[in-house]
Design a protein with these regions (language model features):
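N-terminal polybasic phosphate/anion-binding patch
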Residues: 1-76, 89, 141, 188-191, ...
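Short, active-site-adjacent cap segments at secondary-structure transitions
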Residues: 21, 83-86, 170
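Residue-level signal for inorganic ion chemistry
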Residues: 25, 61, 81, 100, ...
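Residue-level signal for short segments within beta-strands and strand-turn junctions
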Residues: 36, 86, 120-122
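Active-site-adjacent loop/tail segments of enzyme domains
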Residues: 56, 82-112, 138
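Anionic-ligand binding region
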Residues: 117-118, 125-126
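Active-site oxyanion/phosphate-handling segment shared across diverse enzymes
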Residues: 129-201
Length: 202
């Protein structure tokens, strides 16, 4: 897939405030508007039934896309979200040092999953939905190693409490799935559908 700047054939918005998702999109030549979508993520998670967390990720992404789509007529709106889970438990973004250490202690020596959900909406209607899942096994880490990592990367706004694009990748013994899925945007799937829909040039 070419990394050159893509020509936008139709108006496009990314419903995200995530700097890493912006960076990924721009690195693949997608230059469009980025607008943070305000949805009650915790309420959606609270009301979610079952343990198919890729479906929850899709639901969150769709709500974000629809919220912006309702405000911008004739714009294609991409919504993306991510759900980190271990043993049927969702790990939210830590927000602070203490929570990050707590989450990493749970992940240490264990396997968890990053679920990336994506949606595209147009004029308040769903055009496309999809998901991708990455499986990650973290090395057994001592408390000192965890604290040292948290101080190094400060992953307070990161799903899973680690920055895979930085030093976080060194925490793992095994990874199955795309690094972009782990970072919260399955760019390969997204580019394919944007080209298929004629929103951008290939």
């Amino acid at each position: 897939m070419s990394l050159d700047n893509k020509t936008l054939n139709k108006p496009l918005i990314f419903a995200t405030g995530s700097s890493i998702r912006k960076d990924i999109a721009k690195s693949f030549g997608i230059n469009c508007d980025f607008i943070k979508s305000e949805v009650d993520e915790e309420l959606i998670k609270l009301n979610f039934q079952g343990n198919k967390y890729h479906e929850l990720a899709i639901q969150l992404a769709t709500e974000k896309s629809l919220t912006i789509s309702d405000q911008y007529k004739d714009y294609y709106v991409v919504g993306v979200d991510q759900v980190c889970c271990i043993n049927n438990e969702i790990l939210n973004k830590p927000g602070n040092k203490e929570n990050a250490i707590f989450s990493l202690k749970k992940l240490s020596g264990n396997t968890h999953y990053q679920n990336c959900g994506m949606a595209i909406c147009l004029n308040g209607k769903i055009v496309w939905q999809s998901s991708a899942v990455a499986e990650l096994t973290m090395k057994p880490l001592s408390l000192d190693q965890i604290e040292e990592y948290v101080e190094l990367d400060k992953p307070f706004n990161c799903s899973g409490s680690y920055k895979f694009e930085s030093h976080g990748k060194d925490l793992f013994s095994n990874v199955k799935g795309s690094e972009y899925t782990i970072q919260g945007l399955d760019i390969d799937q997204l580019l394919d559908i944007l080209i298929k829909e004629g929103i951008i040039n290939g």
